């Protein structure tokens, strides 16, 4: 056991109620099938409320009208969020046309939401349309299995449109990892696809009868781009190439961003380097990491159940050695790799295969027909003629991939005619928010609806200080769960209450440093006042090429988080230099 962090391999104590629920669920069936036929409520009852998450759904309601409905003695307007499993974010144009139609015909909001998990979500699916959405996805070769709850979630892969061969190889591994770590229960097929029940006992050789202690996230990343924010994830395979061909991966384990306000047992953490592995060991190593976390993760306290906490409790070396034992390998030393950025390159780029790729900026990932900007219709029209594929990025944007020279002008005209290609500032391109209100039940403050106007104000500050073409990686998340990845931003806003946020500073542009809380529970005017002063200093005092986050650390404005298990919460509201 590590001398630095000695602790038990298994946490003893009363199991959380989620563990009971999983054990009693009959491999994730529960009584979901019966609940579907209950027309007295628009939601799912009892354990089914949580069990549907294993099937890719969350039960939500419209919080904008919750109080109004309560006054009318009505239950909340329940509706489901469904998240598709889409390893690497690649979707065919045929599949896109199907999801476009479903969103228009069968959801309350009529939108498609691209997420920073490199997939799409439907919001506002009424109970009567839950089974049809799964059947629609199946009809075009998609599913929503294991995109939520205590499983390996959608596997991310760098959206690299330039080096087509390397991207293709990395993407294939993302798919293989996703398939290898899927649950084996037939519950999904039986409930949603009406497949016949088989008179055999379900087995889960990798995930186990009670699945994982907590959600688990995996990435495949191609340096020098860190577009998938590897340090937000439990398990990361960093592609190592020789002469443009993939030869193996560096493995990093134990990243994660979610915290709980005021709970100092929770913290954001960057992933730890384990070592290098040749390609042929990839699936064995992935399985070994997952099963080690399955067996050693904390099942008594879900707030302390993620892989990052397991590593801190047992020690990185102990966890790594167990992975080696289970996989039957010894990691080689980490091979050199470097990240230089994580934003998407908006506009056209030409790949080495001579095909063109058009990256479209989709603010907050929300695809809808807005007045004067019919984005959803535009993408549908492109999907009808495009013979390549679409790629959803981890920055909530969309790539029209593999466009031949002969189609380039036609696709660009469609994009421009529908408001999909507009001049966008570097600051807006590098700003992102989670959904939050009105649909997320965990939301404490606005995020998606807040960010566009807030970005306008930050742009005005940059203009005021003579640096309008600069950018700061900025993220807003409506609660401390961290879906907006604010804990890897240069400016991170974390919702605390309606209209109030914690302001975190000191991350960097490449996403390898956790920002520290600078001010707590403050309003938008307070945030903007602080940013005005700090950005003014950055504009005058920065070194050549120095990003805002690096400047705040170098200038002593914020102390960097060096060892989050011990110093993430240190010196709240600390201002080490006058601003």
From Swiss-Prot:
Its cofactor is siroheme; [4Fe-4S] cluster. Siroheme binds at residue 483. This is Sulfite reductase [NADPH] hemoprotein beta-component. InterPro entries: CysI, NiRdtase/SiRdtase_haem-b_fer, Nit/Sulf_reduc_fer-like_dom_sf, NO2/SO3_Rdtase_4Fe4S_dom, NO2/SO3_Rdtase_4Fe4S_prot, NO2/SO3_Rdtase_4Fe4S_sf, NO2/SO3_Rdtase_FeS/sirohaem_BS. It catalyses: hydrogen sulfide + 3 NADP(+) + 3 H2O = sulfite + 3 NADPH + 4 H(+). It comes from Salmonella choleraesuis (strain SC-B67). One of its GO terms (molecular function) is metal ion binding. NCBIfam families: CysI (TIGR02041), PRK13504.1 (NF010029). Coiled coil: none annotated. It is an enzyme of class 1 (oxidoreductase). Component of the sulfite reductase complex that catalyzes the 6-electron reduction of sulfite to sulfide. This is one of several activities required for the biosynthesis of L-cysteine from sulfate. Binds 1 siroheme per subunit. Binds 1 [4Fe-4S] cluster per subunit. Belongs to the nitrite and sulfite reductase 4Fe-4S domain family. Pathway: Sulfur metabolism; hydrogen sulfide biosynthesis; hydrogen sulfide from sulfite (NADPH route): step 1/1. One of its GO terms (biological process) is hydrogen sulfide biosynthetic process. Alpha(8)-beta(8). The alpha component is a flavoprotein, the beta component is a hemoprotein. [4Fe-4S] cluster binds at residues 434, 440, 479, 483. GO terms for cellular component: sulfite reductase complex (NADPH). Keywords: 4Fe-4S, Amino-acid biosynthesis, Cysteine biosynthesis, Heme, Iron, Iron-sulfur, Metal-binding, NADP, Oxidoreductase.
